[in-house]
């Protein structure tokens, strides 16, 4: 009887994270690094409740015996990304901004939309260009909920967060996207290193033509 009552008031929450685009063999690239916390919504709760690694399940974190109710899930991730964003990403976002190519999905859009305004335009090209040249060194990770096909990224607060209604055991699947990594080339075994420890990049110039945007992109990149 006690066990029954216990289950009526508590639940287990589980969240998994893998990197956008699996390996060539289709295997997920699980990520254990992101910090996930559930914050209660019925009270002021800035501390939150940490999700812990689920033994035997890479990329999965969970919390058992959670009080049922309304929560906000917040996801944070810090990881070195040196060299992951390069000229290929600049050209990729340039093609998207001009409508030459279309995004393959919400994750692709999150990678290309550098400033998070919902548009992919020359401002995003400039942002990715600055990052590829090392002018900017900030690595920003965004997360996407596979089930609802929605982004957790909130541009106003610069946080990854989503509402969770915990009325029973709940499991969600998230994808991690590195901002600016338009071709999803990030590989932790290669790029998870501090910029100063990495060799100095030799940035390739953008191919010039008569397009004003490209010429402007070149001139701005060298003056900043």
Task: Give residue ranges: language-model regions.
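Conserved small/polar residues in nucleotide/adenosyl-binding loops
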Residues: 195, 223-224
């Amino acid at each position: 009887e006690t066990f029954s009552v216990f289950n009526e008031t508590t639940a287990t929450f589980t969240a998994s994270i893998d990197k956008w685009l699996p390996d060539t063999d289709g295997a997920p690239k699980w990520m254990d690094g992101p910090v996930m916390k559930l914050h209660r919504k019925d009270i002021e709760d800035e501390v939150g409740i940490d999700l812990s690694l689920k033994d035997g399940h890479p990329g999965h974190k969970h919390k058992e015996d959670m009080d049922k109710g309304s929560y906000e899930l917040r996801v944070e991730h810090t990881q070195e990304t040196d060299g992951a964003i390069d000229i290929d990403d600049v050209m990729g976002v340039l093609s998207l901004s001009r409508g030459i190519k279309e995004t393959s999905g919400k994750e692709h859009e999150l990678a290309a939309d550098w400033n998070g305004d919902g548009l992919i335009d020359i401002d995003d090209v400039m942002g990715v260009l600055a990052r590829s040249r090392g002018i900017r060194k900030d690595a920003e990770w965004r997360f996407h909920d596979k089930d609802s096909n929605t982004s957790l990224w909130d541009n106003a607060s610069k946080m990854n967060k989503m509402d969770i209604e915990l009325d029973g055991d709940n499991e969600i699947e998230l994808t991690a996207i590195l901002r600016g990594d338009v071709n999803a080339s990030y590989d932790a075994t290669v790029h998870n290193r501090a910029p100063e420890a990495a060799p100095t990049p030799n940035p390739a110039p953008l191919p010039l033509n008569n397009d004003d945007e490209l010429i402007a992109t070149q001139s701005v990149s060298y003056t900043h």
